[in-house]
Structures are given as C-alpha cells and as structure tokens.
C-alpha cells in the first residue's frame, strides 16, 4: 500500500506498458509460445492458459503515435494490401515482414487469436498472417447484431465457439484447461472492467477531473491487462486519483479551465494525438466521453459462459444503428 502512495497511476501505467512488452519478448526468448490477439477478444482464455499475448492494434497505435507508421504501411501496400485497409492492419502486416520497429519491437507469434466483433477487416488480416507465417489461427466469427438486442442464437453460437476454442488451446499447449483458474480470471477481469468504468465515469462531474485524452493512454492496459492483478490495481489507483480531484473541485488541466465538453466518436488519430489535444485544450474543450474506450467495459457474471458470450457480442461496433444512436445519447 505504501508503494501506491508514492506511485501515481501514470507512473504505474508506464511501468506496465514496459513490463507487458518485455514479458512477451522474454517469453519468446525462452521458447514459450506467443499469441497475437485482436483487441476485444475473449482474453480470459489466454490468461487462464498463461500464454504471453501481444495486441497488434496497441502496437500499431504506439508506432503511429511515434510517427513511425509510414515504413510499415508502404511495405504492406507494396505487397499488394489495399490502402482501403485500416492503418492498424497495414502497420501490423508491414511489421510482420520487417520485424523491427524503432518505437517498440514485439515477438513474432506462434498462434493467432481473432474475434470479429470489432470489424470484418480483422478476419482477412489474421487469415493472411496465418497463411504467411504458417501458424494456427483461432477465429471467433461474430455475427453482426441487426436487431436491437443481441439475439439468443448469436449468444449460443458465440458460446459454442468459446467452448471449441478451449479445446483448440488445449491441443496447442498440450495442457488441460484449468476451469477453476478460469473462474478466477473471469472474476478479476470483471472487477478490472468495473474500475475502468468507475474511473472514466468521473468525467460526468463538472468540471471533469479527467482529461479525456488520458483515456486513450490508459486504454492500452484495459486491452491487454483486463484479466490480471496489475490491471486491476492500475484502474483502482486511477479511479482514486480522479475521485480526489473531483472532491477538490479540480478540472482536467492545471493551466486551463474546462469551458466546453465534447464527445469523441471513433478511433483516436494516433499520429496527431498531441496536436489534437493541444488544439482543443487551447479553447477549453475537454473530451469527456467516447464511444471507443467504453468498448472494453466487458462485464458478465463469474462462471457464466453464456453471459460472457453475450458480453463479447455486445460491443457497440457490432450493434445496429438504433442501438448506437441510443448509446451516444447515454
């Protein structure tokens, strides 16, 4: 507890980012398998199996934020990948060929883990990686929700895929799946998501103690550390800091007052994040909510596999227009 008093959540965030990548590189060096996974996948399965996992979308965003994306995009397009593909895909496909980035290296994968609840691009992106690298792919095919609520047949379909994926992971690792540990990971993942939600909800206070662009920074860890104790500790720390600021009546910045509050819809513009932040701050504009970071508020009851299936099927990018309109209003 004393460490928490000395350490800010931002300090801890930076430590965890370094720990995440160093751990994956070390696992590879020790001959352990490494997984590349999409950002909103059933990571609880991977956490249960103690598989070192890297998220190419996080990595591509980091490369973009450091102005290093062009080399990888040009490489991917030179191999025939269309410029219509998102830069996340093109940066990663380029990195899979070059395998070196000044911003941050990641180990090459032994297994791919893909869930199509965020977009359809990830399907062909990961299929191409699987074919090029000659490694197995575990794919969760997520039907789009044309109805307002997630239909029961979609929940059953996704649950069946989760159950099948457990068998695939057992075949890949040559180890049995530990269902007791799975329950613990599910519980921790939900608790972490709850602290993430509680922390970001402080933006509802006027003035907001939260600088909305911080959500994009902390988001890296809600992607890759939802199911472990470090992620839980981080978001509890962040929540407590924001609560203290709110009670003290402090706004998002020390050098400016919050005058306008806006919602950010969609993905951050990673190469120009600083420019965007400074331009908005100059006019007292604070981004207090976004449809993007809330995507990782994946919650369900412990040991409820159908609830877990529904939670992963419920991502706003996988919902119909009526639902998305109401989500924006909420």
Predicted feature descriptions by range:
Residues 45, 124-128, 275-279:
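A short acidic, amphipathic alpha-helical/loop segment
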Residues 37-105, 110, 117, 125-126:
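An N-terminal, globular interaction/scaffold subdomain
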Residues 95-97, 102-202:
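Internal, well-ordered alpha/beta segment that forms a basic, Gly-enriched binding/recognition surface
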Residues 76-84, 156-168, 307-317:
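A polyampholytic, Gly/Pro-enriched intrinsically disordered region
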Residues 11-14, 86-93, 316-325:
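Short, flexible loop segments at the rims of nucleotide/cofactor-binding pockets, characterized by
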Residues 1-33, 163, 167-293, 297-298:
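A charged, amphipathic alpha-helical module
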Residues 48-77, 267-330:
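Redox- and metal-dependent alpha/beta enzyme cores, enriched for Fe-S-associated oxidoreductases
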Residues 35-37, 53-56, 112-114, 136-141, ...:
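A structural signal for short, well-ordered beta-strand segments and their strand-loop junctions
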């Amino acid at each position: 507890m004393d460490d928490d008093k000395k350490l800010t959540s931002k300090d801890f965030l930076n430590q965890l980012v370094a720990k995440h990548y160093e751990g994956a590189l070390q696992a590879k060096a020790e001959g352990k398998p490494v997984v590349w996974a999409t950002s909103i996948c059933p990571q609880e399965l991977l956490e249960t199996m103690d598989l070192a996992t890297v998220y190419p979308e996080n990595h591509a965003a980091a490369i973009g934020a450091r102005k290093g994306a062009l080399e990888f995009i040009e490489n991917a397009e030179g191999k025939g990948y269309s410029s219509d593909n998102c830069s996340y895909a093109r940066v990663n496909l380029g990195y899979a060929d070059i395998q070196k980035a000044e911003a941050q290296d990641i180990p090459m994968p032994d297994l791919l883990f893909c869930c199509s609840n965020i977009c359809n691009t990830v399907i062909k992106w990961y299929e191409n990686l699987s074919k090029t690298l000659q490694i197995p792919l575990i794919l969760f095919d997520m039907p789009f929700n044309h109805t307002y609520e997630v239909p029961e047949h979609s929940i059953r379909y996704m649950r069946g895929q989760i159950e099948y994926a457990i068998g695939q992971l057992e075949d890949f690792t040559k180890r049995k799946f530990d269902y007791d540990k799975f329950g613990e990971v599910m519980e921790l993942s939900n608790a972490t998501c709850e602290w993430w939600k509680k922390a970001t909800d402080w933006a509802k206070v006027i003035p907001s103690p939260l600088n909305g662009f911080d959500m994009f920074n902390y988001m890296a860890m809600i992607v890759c550390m939802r199911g472990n104790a470090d992620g839980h500790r981080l978001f509890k720390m962040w929540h407590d800091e924001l609560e203290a600021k709110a009670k003290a009546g402090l706004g998002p910045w020390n050098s400016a007052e919050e005058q306008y509050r806006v919602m950010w819809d969609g993905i951050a513009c990673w190469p120009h994040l600083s420019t965007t932040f400074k331009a908005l701050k100059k006019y007292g504009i604070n981004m207090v909510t976004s449809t993007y970071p809330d995507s990782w508020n994946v919650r369900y009851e412990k040991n409820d596999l159908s609830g877990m299936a529904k939670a992963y099927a419920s991502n706003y990018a996988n919902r119909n227009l009526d639902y998305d309109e109401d989500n924006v209003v909420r």
